[in-house]
Amino acid sequence: MKKIILTVFAATSLLLYSTPSFALLSVSVGMPMGATVPAKDSDGDPVWDVDETSGYFIGVQLPFAVGLGVDSHKIGLKNTPTRKLATDIYNIFYQLPIPVVNLILGLGTGKQTVECPTCAEGTMVSEVYNGETYSYNGGFKPGSVTQWYTSIGIPILPLFDIHLSYRSITSKNIVAGGDTKMDYSSTVTGIGLAFNF
C-alpha cells in the first residue's frame, strides 16, 4: 500500500511540474501567419485570394484553467488590393490538463468589417460601362462573427512555451450594396509565446 501511495504521489508531482497548466497566471501573445477565405463563386473558383495577414492574438489564463482573450487581425485580398477584411473577436478558452503539451480549446464572438476607400456603409459608387454611368451602393455593413479555435503549445522552459494555433471563423452576414449578404468565413493560423507565472 505504501508503494502505491508513493508511486501515485511521485507521478502526480511529475505531472504537475511538467505542465504549466497549473500555473497561477499565464499570458500569451501571438500573431497570424496565414489565412484562407474559402468562399467560391458559382463556377467553383475562389472569390478571394489572400495576400497578407497582420494583427495579434492576446490571451490571459486564470488560475482555474479558464482564460479570456482577444483577437484583432486583418486579411489583405489580392484581387482587390485596397480591400482588407478586419476582424475583432473576444474569446473564452480552456486549457486541457495534459502533461508535456498545452492544448487549448476556445470559442469566440465579435465583428467583422470590410475596409477600403469605398467600403464605408452607405457609400455610393459610380462606374462607366459601355458609355453609360451607373451608380450603386458600394458600401459594406459590418457583420457578426463566431469562431472556434485550438492551440497546441510545447514548453521550452518551465516559464514559457511556444504554440501554434488554428482558428475557424464563420462570417455570413456582412451586407454588401445594401441587401446582399456575403460569406467571408475564413481560417487563420498563428504562432505565439505564452509566459507562465
Regions found by a protein language model. Name each.
Residues 24-26, 154, 184-197:
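Outer-membrane beta-barrel "beta-signal"
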Residues 37-49, 73-85, 114-133, 138-140, ...:
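Outer-membrane beta-barrel translocator domains and adjoining extracellular loop/strand segments
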Residues 46-56, 62, 84-92, 99, ...:
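Residues that define the transmembrane beta-barrel architecture of outer-membrane proteins
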Residues 58, 68-72, 92-94, 105-107, ...:
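Membrane-embedded beta-strands that build the outer-membrane beta-barrel scaffold
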Residues 21-80, 99, 109-114, 196:
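Short glycine/proline- and aromatic-enriched beta-strand/turn motifs that initiate or cap beta-hairpins
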Residues 4-13:
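Sec-dependent N-terminal signal peptides
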